[in-house]
Amino acid sequence: MGMWSIGAGAIGVAALALLLANTDMFLAKPEKAALEYLEDIDLKTLEKDAVTFKAKALWEKNGAVIMAVRRPGCFLCREEATDLSSLKPKLDELGVPLYAVVKEHIKNEVKDFQPYFKGEIFLDENKKFYGPQRRKMMFMGFVRLGVWQNFFRAWNGGFSGNLDGEGFILGGVFVMGPGKQGILLEHREKEFGDKVNLTSVLEAARKIRPQTSASEKQ
């Protein structure tokens, strides 16, 4: 009787832990980024003679859609990159560029990611686009039903990947307006494979008002 009671209690505790892991109760809440914070981020180009520049250069004239990639080798990230790239023709019509930032540049990870993403990619080695408060999903992610649904969705879509690089710091997607128009959309990944809504991305991109130079006004 005693062993049965202990066993039943252990099962109950495990069931409760599994239930709680599938709520948002213990997920780190994202801190909204200020425009000034994003503008001041240092980014690098990925060629051998890397050039460092401020992130605001990406959107100061025409706005931009920017993906902060959790890990280029992740098949879930490759799926989202493909989804965002499907918007490229419509973004081109709007004159809005599509970019991505990665937090590390190792092996051929970015090169192998490029076929999935139809925009330029830059290095954010200080991981600022993943802040101001960096959020991590550790092994709890593997007991979340939503994560497994995302896994199966990407697998069924034919996506594959690898385990190279840091993959616990969660990423996101931003739609930036030019100049001081500000952040028009900020999607913070809450769990592995939590993709941005593509309709919301396009709606935000359509709100972008390109900057006109003084010569164009005359």
Curated annotation (Swiss-Prot):
Residues 3-101 are annotated as: Thioredoxin fold. Involved in redox regulation of the cell. Acts as an antioxidant. Inhibits TNFSF11-induced NFKB1 and JUN activation and osteoclast differentiation. May affect bone resorption and help to maintain bone mass. Acts as a negative regulator of macrophage-mediated inflammation by inhibiting macrophage production of inflammatory cytokines, probably through suppression of the MAPK signaling pathway. The active site cysteines correspond to the redox-active cysteines of peroxiredoxins. This is Peroxiredoxin-like 2A. Belongs to the peroxiredoxin-like PRXL2 family. PRXL2A subfamily. It is found in: Cytoplasm; Secreted. The keyword Hydrolase does not apply. Keywords: Antioxidant, Cytoplasm, Redox-active center, Secreted. It comes from Bos taurus. One of its GO terms (molecular function) is antioxidant activity. The active site is at 74 (redox-active), 77 (redox-active). One of its GO terms (cellular component) is extracellular region. It comes from the Eukaryota.
